[in-house]
């Protein structure tokens, strides 16, 4: 059954759903390439795998399929300027070389990310306007978020993760 919910109503509902802001990156013949994304989640612990939903017209879409690898870099509140850079620049201009290095697959990873998942491309599935990209996690790197929580997108603005005081 096709949904009868109107697109603006769906978009408003999803704006209320907080999501971790990530930089999804890979390499291409023109250098590093990536996008900012919130449609990322774990798929399975055995085997360790994740999924990323990437618009079929996004600059990184075909590059991930061609490279066969990608990295998901969870951003912290320190990375608001990086999000702006990704929205204002294109291609390799989004990447300040001193901040990025490969882990295992060759995909660029952010040196001070809250978390990095370095993945090999495992499978893809059609998701209407998007491709659901499944990655096998080849390497992980956990950063420090003690002084800066994870960067979230909630109600169409930046938010931060922070622990709640137990009651």
Model-predicted segments: where are they?
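Basic, polyanion-binding surface patches
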Residues: 1-167
């Amino acid at each position: 059954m096709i949904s009868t919910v109107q697109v603006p109503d769906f978009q408003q509902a999803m704006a209320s759903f907080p999501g971790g802001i990530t930089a999804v990156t890979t390499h291409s013949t023109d250098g590093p390439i990536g996008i900012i994304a919130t449609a990322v989640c774990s798929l399975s612990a055995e085997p360790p795998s994740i999924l990323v939903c990437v618009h079929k017209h996004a600059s990184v879409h075909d590059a991930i399929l061609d490279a066969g690898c990608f990295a998901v870099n969870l951003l912290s509140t320190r990375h608001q300027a990086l999000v702006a850079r990704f929205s204002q620049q294109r291609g390799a201009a989004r990447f300040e070389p001193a901040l990025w290095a490969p882990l295992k697959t060759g995909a660029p990873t952010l040196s001070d990310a809250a978390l990095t998942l370095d993945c090999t491309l495992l499978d893809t599935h059609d998701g209407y306007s998007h491709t659901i990209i499944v990655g096998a996690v080849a390497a992980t790197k956990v950063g420090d978020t003690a002084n800066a929580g994870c960067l979230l997108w909630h109600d169409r603005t930046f938010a931060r993760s922070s622990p709640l005081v137990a009651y």
